[in-house]
Amino acid sequence: MRISIKLLGKSDTALLIKSVLSSIEREFPVPTTESTAALQSSALTFQELLFRLQSFWADRGCVLQQPYDVEVGAGTMAPETFLRVLGPKPYRVGYAQPSRRPADGRYGENPNRLFKHTQFQLILKPPPVNVQELYLQSLEAIGIDLSRHDLKFEEDNWEWPAGGAWGVGWQVMLDGLEITQFTYFQQCGGMDLDPICAELTYGLERIAAFLQDVDSIYEIVWARDPETGAPVTYGEVRLAEELQFSVYNFEEADVAKLWEHFNLFEAEAKELLGKADGLFASETASAGEKQRFPLLATYELALKCSNLFNVLDARGAISVTERVGVIGRIRALAVGVARAYAAQQAA
Amino acid sequence: MSDFLLEIGLEEVPARMIAGAEAELGRRVKELLTRERLLAAEAKVTTYSTPRRLAVLVEGVLAAQADAEEQLTGPSWKVAFKDGAATAAAEAFAKKAGVPVSALEKVTTAKGEYAGATVKRQGVSATQLLAGELPKEVLGLYWAKNMYWRAGKPERFVRPVRWVVAMLDAAVVPLEIAGIAAGNASRGHRVLHGGAPVSLASARSYQEALRTAKVIVDVAERRHSIRKALDKATRTVVGARWREDEPLVETVVHLTEWPSVILGDFDREYLTLPEEVLVTVMRDHQKYFAVEDAHSKLAPHFLAVLNTEADADGEAIIRHGNQKVLVARFKDARFFWDFDQKTPLTERVESLKQVTFQKQLGSYHWKTEQNLGVTRALAAAVKNAGLAFDETALLKAVELAKTDLTTELVKEFTELQGIVGGLYARAQHLGERVALAIYEQYTPASTEDNIPVSVEGQLLGLADRIQTIVAMFGIGNAPTGSKDPFALRRAANAIVKILAESELPLTLDSVLDGSGADGANKEQVAAFLRERLHFYLKDMRSFPYDVVNAVLAAGANDVRDAIARAEALTAARKSADFEAISAAFKRIKNILRQAGEKGFAVGEAQGGKLTPEAQQLADAAAALAPKVAALREKRAYGEALAEIATLRPVVDAFFDKVMVLDPDPQVRGAHLSLIDGVLRSFSGIADFSEIVTA
């Protein structure tokens, strides 16, 4: 059983989300000998992989959302997961989520590691009884013939202490490669969930490299010209971003200013949370007043803090003594929003 | 007589939990049937499990409980019948017993005459009883970690229950577990069989029906089949053997329903990576078995246990995938290794300030400073006793011991901490003794593990662990009950084991002194170490508990001495003379305790008048005491105990003839003085009164 403790020492909230996913872009197929060309031409492109997953789950009643437009360390942190799992309302949603782990950046030089990787995140609340079968069908839908592969569900539980969240589940192993994290959420924001939900997180780069049988993430075919079949690679699309953000995160980010940003975002979030506390405790406030309270905006401020912390950490600007305290500050915001959100839903 | 089958269908249960749950389910079903008088005398209970199911088959279930007759006693006969007519009391009793008043009979007991009724209890059918009772038993199974899955959270279980089979012979037992009604349909292998239900004709057909659906439900059969498949796959490489790894076999047994094995290869160039790294990647990260050549050297192959059976093309695809994953991990490891060499261990000491040891205590830099202090104290004690070792190398090793925590390789493979440090120290030419001590610092990792071979490694291991224990106790993190989050018991066990199995001239007290502990903290840790020594002697060395108590009552500081005494005592206690001596010492202790309670003074043996038997004992003891003391000094405990056993005739005669607590205070005082002296003179090896005699 692996939980995210290992990453705790590394870089806070964003990084903590999934120990397993943090390494999704690390472990990865390597040079090949036979049949690579044949595989590459027939295997799905990176974007086709996403299309297939999206349409598979849309056909099964999921809302397709767009990636959340604030920096997050994992799909779990987007409000479509972190907040929607709270309360009794059923919900099914899928979205691709670019997920930032500043400390994992390698200037685009490491074939297996990325500053920003893509998760396809799925929340099924409540989980259907055949959720595992549906998941297996989704693998068939992206071209994996299960009769010619070895599939195992191996225990892997998950926790995100800063979000007061945990669940039990598996890492799904395909021919020895971890391709998905499958979690039954049990708690979020320190609150018991009822109904619980199933969270499926597909590591897209890893799956694409597996399907295309390539050595490096940057060799993944992102798209193909429909006329000529000429490939556009992952490297062409994203390499510059990996390089420049590594430079920023490790070299250029202005530590003093990052702290200023952090403090500003935190101060505003705290002020809003203070107001929320009063409002949701009030017996005279109307339901309408409660429902218009901008908790979603408050949550964005908390996410900003989390990402800033990760950049500061990558920059080597967080000392041992500071670390625990800063994580605690982020936890106070995240858990505070979750609690207020639950109260708002009940209002 | 019927066969009963229960199968709980689950989403994949964690491998580590399956064996325990399977056994518990079998036990619970058997106990239920026994309790309810439904188990035939010759019944056979068989359990099965796979990652997706727990099952139990009972051959020999009675169709129903036997009918029983029960005698009920009601009101006294006089109250029940007045003048031959039934009273209201009789009617109420008859109603309660469910018989007509006319059926009441007179029962005569020792207390008098009562109205009685004989009631027939019709036995409940197995179907009815199982339907009512079994769900509670299933939901009562212990799991290390549970979850909820249904709305309203009606039950907790390890993973969602997805189907239930409950059958008595060919008939379904109508029970419901976690909202799932039992039926006669099981499920087969996810991929090889697919989603079609596997209908069972009868309970007894379970194992064979599932085999047809590509599931081997019997754990022993899967284990056997995996071992055979590992052998077979390995035989394709001349001279090769797979590296035996029983825990890994158990894991893959519980990860598969229809196992097969493939042999994969990797490029020989990766064999230049340390074997420790290669094996960790294969075993811990990928659950692959390592393969070795005829010289027990790692060979460039691995064995993966699959949960499927593929055709040749499929096998090629699966092999290719597994090889790629493994090689990518090896490449990562090599990358980390090369990257880490850019910053030698000696330049990493400062960065330990960035690694937290314990937030209330400090960083690993702080920890290293502390360890250096403890090590210097222990080194001085060892030097004084004349044991040779390389002190410079030791201090260097302590200084660098934790620096591997800052390396990428250890961040990736945390289980290799210490080992990586040792390998790096060697690669960086810091000296073989330094490297070895760092490498061995965490051994023994378990009670079965060996202790470090080098004196430097032993001292580093002792200093590191005692420092941790004392510091953790100091901030209130001592283990309590089953909670030991900082693994302090394991650390203390390792201290005891190192002292027991090394030649270090150190005792528990001298180790504790070296830690600089004082006051209440020191007393607490001292007691904790003694408790671990008790555990070591009893559970690791298997000495009888009374021998352990006896030996430790006479001294629990010098670990190797305690072992020697325990060995001698274990051998000696079997003799009849020694048993008698033990009994006598127990008696002496009791008498002295009584005397103390009554306020009797211990007098003077010499001045007092002694009876002949008492005098004989006094003389024999006086003659023997210096001999025993000399043997004890030489640690010739076996001989010393044999000498003590020779006291038996005079001790027996003394207790036969002498009334110890004589009414005359002077005589009594002399006797007490005598036996007190005997006890003191001969209890230095063990407190014999602790020995349990027949």
Please provide the spans of the model-predicted regions:
Chain A
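Structured aminoacyl-transfer and RNA-binding surfaces used for tRNA recognition/handling
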Residues: 20-283, 289-345
